[in-house]
Amino acid sequence: MSGLPTQHAVPALVLAYFAYYGVLGIFIPYLGLFLDGRGLSSYDIGLLLALVTATRIVGPSLWSLVAERQGRPLRIMRLGAVLALLGWLSSFFDYGFWLLLLGFSLFSFFWTAILPQLEVTTFHFLNDNTSRYSRIRSSGSVGYIVLVLVGGVLLQSFGTEALPYGAALLMLLLIGSLFLLPELSAPTENSAERKGFGRLLTQPVFLCFMGAAFILQMSFAPFYGFFTLYARDLGYSGVATGLFISLAVLAEIIAFFWMGALLKQRSYRLVLSCCYGLTMVRWLMLAYLAHSPLWLAVSMLMHAGSFAIAHSCAMQFVQHYFPKALRSRGQALYAGLIFGGGGAVGAYAAGILWQDGAGATQTFVIAAITAGVAMLCALCLPAQVHAEPSKRAAH
């Protein structure tokens, strides 16, 4: 085993989450502005985001399978980070839509090798302690909030072309942190567990959970793809936009710290359905009240429920639903179908509906309706997910 001793892996995990989500702090909020600065229409932006996001459908499961068969998840993370950086370098050059599509698609495909393995690695070192996971995961939120603020300053001071360079520096930091982590030994997986994985995917509770998460992720697409353009059109500066996004992530950080206690006191179904309902209200506020800084700030605070608590619930579901030997595969499946599939469908639809800003209100209204449908699906889930049902499925 190379790298840091196991007991000292937590600082490296904290740094890895900080850098990983720091990259996303530049990539996600400001990508719409960056592409707009390159002369792309809202339809082109939506199409590019959809095609790039679609690489996340297959990527996580493919990389997870490779990591599982090799028994070396850390090597897969390192390889993914290095190759993602190489793909990202294409954004330094302005040669039109197709080069951006190729470069960002390569970046996204290799980027998907990182997070599922990082989540599994984290739970391994924490002995499946979800409360400690939430605290370590919050370092990613800190990275996101810091880089959103830095991105706003870069945007206002140097323009959109400065953003790719900031993200590249964070990728180098991520690569360094991954080389500090110790390698994991391959988990023991018996043949019954291998056969049981397929059966798990057809269980009603799993289908209901994935359907709800998929639909909710679709509703996030207008926010992720077009919020910075929306804020600019409403008259907010780049720094102000960064502050609003940072407020959302600050609420997310606070939520991660008391997430464990919340799930002990309330049912899984209640918490998740409330988060989805809150998301519906949030998109309606963006549709009709975003011109008011106060109400825009309130809608950003709702990110604590619509993302942070909902994400922690989803991670707990995956950890409890799949046995330890299959969790990497379960994490990859979740990441691919939800963030890849749901994100791609939502991004493409948002690009069509946005109409270069003319359809902004109706886009967020449709997003709210979509979140409402996700809430109805969540209400059909069991109150709690306690055991690993795969053990039953394998018999």
Model-derived segments and spans:
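Structural signature of the two symmetry-related core transmembrane helices
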Residues: 75-89, 270-285
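A membrane-interface helix-boundary motif in multi-pass transporters
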Residues: 153-169, 352-371
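Juxtamembrane intracellular "pre-TM" segments in multi-pass secondary transporters
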Residues: 2-7, 181-213
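Helix-loop junctions at membrane interfaces in 12-TM secondary transporters
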Residues: 10, 92-104, 287-299
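Helix-loop boundary and gating motifs at the non-cytosolic
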Residues: 3-53, 206-244
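Helix-to-loop junctions at the C-terminal end of transmembrane segments
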Residues: 58-72, 155, 254-267, 354-355
